[in-house]
Amino acid sequence: MSAVQPQEAFAVPAWSSPLAENPEVVLELRNLTKHYARRRGQSAPPAVQQVSLQVRRGEVLCLMGTSGSGKSTLLRHINRLIEPSSGEVLIDGSAISQLSAQELRTLRSRRIGMVFQHFGLLPHRSVRDNVALPLELRGEPEALRHAAADLQLHAMGLDGWGDHYPHELSGGMQQRVGLARALVSEPDILLMDEPFSALDPTIRRDLQSHFLQVVRERGITTLLVTHDPAEALRLADRIAVLRHGQLIQVGTPEELLKQPADAEVADFFQEHGARSATPMATIAPRKSATTPAPLSPGLSFAQALLLGPAALAASGRGGLYWLGFALELGAVAALGQGLATASFAWAALALIGLLSSRLLSVALARRPSRLRRSDWRLPWLVLLLSQALVLWRVLATDASGPWLQFPADRQVLLGTAAAIDQLIAWSQVTFESTFVGVIVAVRTVIESTESLLGWLPWPVPALALVLLAWRSAGAALALTSAAALLYIGLFGFWERTIATLALVGSSVLISLLIGVPAGILLAKRALARRLITPLLDVMQTLPTFVYLIPAVAFFSVGKTPAVIATVIFALAPMIRLTALGIQEVPKTAVEAALAHGATPWQILTKVELPLAAGSLLLGINQTLVMSLSMVVVAALIGAGGLGYDVMTALRNIKGGEGMLAGAAIVFCALIPDRIIQATLRQRDRTLHQS
């Protein structure tokens, strides 16, 4: 096989489309506009406004402008990483807005390559796999895509670096990898978003020369985003100058130097060549749309003195309102005590508290502030009502009635409880097959796990655990694991430990099967976050034994309801940490995969989940520890295991036996926790080492 055969294997016919009006024009932007959603109280000018531009085949066009001018936003419209609010992007005369999802992925993976300012490399993959990513996303065979990647690495001067990882390369080398990845599918359009700005000057100049040589040799149409005038003048055939989302001027470097469109364009390039003395026109710079919030005037002395803490609430200082609230209630209580006992000391204390609160209110509420103001009426009414009730409570020695004791109705409680019982009974009849299915599935998992662990000769799991501990964290944890196993075996806890591990392992497995998909949904859907997050908050605040009530109500007693209660108790951290891991995946890595034709499933499985593995491991660890914390509580409904030994010891008031069984539970939590923590530290060193 010749050196070029891998690349030839990926060659595709030209994208079928109507002929462009101008055969030299490969890319056209027509009246492109992009509006983003407005923030509350602020106007949002268009990020891109009515931009029309044509790019000829093989041309290097620089999108030039200061930060915030819309360069990168405009560039991302070309491969639909950003959808326009209006206008069209045409490639070879065909509007890409009409492409289906599959056609768009084909366009990205075969015709358009993209290079990013911050590289967008996947830290968990080798350099070779990073370069071959666009071909992998297309489903090309491994041998062909690796051969093509090696060919591009050779062209970039990176021979021998294919088996290394991105953190082992310098910034310039990483950007060469990014350029090789963009070119591996032989695109005819190359998008480059400030690819040289993060590099040292010497590395930058060398990589610029190499880039220019490659695109000239291959005839690649290139759009290069930059804010560096020298870079644009040196690399571009033409330069498009943008300002506040508007296209100000398009021309060759010579035209921009000799005939700038206005004074700002002239000033932009003045240090890099001669320019005309008189610019063609002057366009006033647009004022920033965002201005600081105006100062709100403070309250008058009389208002602040009269309202007291309510003045602080009205001026946006809610925390200080509660401090004044507490001071004044204390002052009122002291005043009531002074009136009841005719004590001067209590009256003086009341005066001090009241003065402290009012002086604090006057001093702070009169100041002008940018804090958001609110209405004073409700805080003031709550303060007055609370003061009146506290004063009444102090003065009324035989206080009773509904103001002191909340009115309760036992019949309401009994009626509500009966309604809940009826609902449970109805559910058990209506959804009997569902409950039976859940019971069978959970019991199968428990019994299979317990049977496997009980069937194995004890040295097999013991040796496996010690070896895993040694490989994960070294000799210290291996010795600790051996000591824990000796303790469990010597004191006769082995069978109980097997039962406990079956219970906990089943709970962790089910939590994984439910928690990971739920966490992914939580990370990707705002509606799911709004609906599920309050439920997770409730799940994480209830006491452990509360989870036994619905489990027993629907599934009776035994190991099955114990596992279900444990899953409900331990599920919330798995969901939250999965969502957190997905949300913390670098946007550049996701965008790079998307720009090269990844499907949503490929982004999830090849980018997000691998990079979120650390958070997933933390979720597993937290779920494991929380499941073990339920062992004793679950023994109340027949879960067995080490929790049964602890409960028996407590019931018979045998503290020694209870402590020994409890120590065995601690060992069951300690060893996996240390193994997972060591794995996380090793992973962090691998991904973040520089």
What are these regions (language model features)?
Residues 165-169, 173:
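Conserved ABC ATPase signature
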Residues 79:
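Helix-to-loop junction immediately C-terminal to a conserved catalytic motif
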Residues 186:
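Conserved catalytic motifs of ABC-family nucleotide-binding domains
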Residues 250-251, 259:
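ABC ATPase "signature
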Residues 564-568, 600-634, 656, 660-672, ...:
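Transmembrane alpha-helices
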Residues 95, 136, 143-161, 213, ...:
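Conserved ABC ATPase "signature" region
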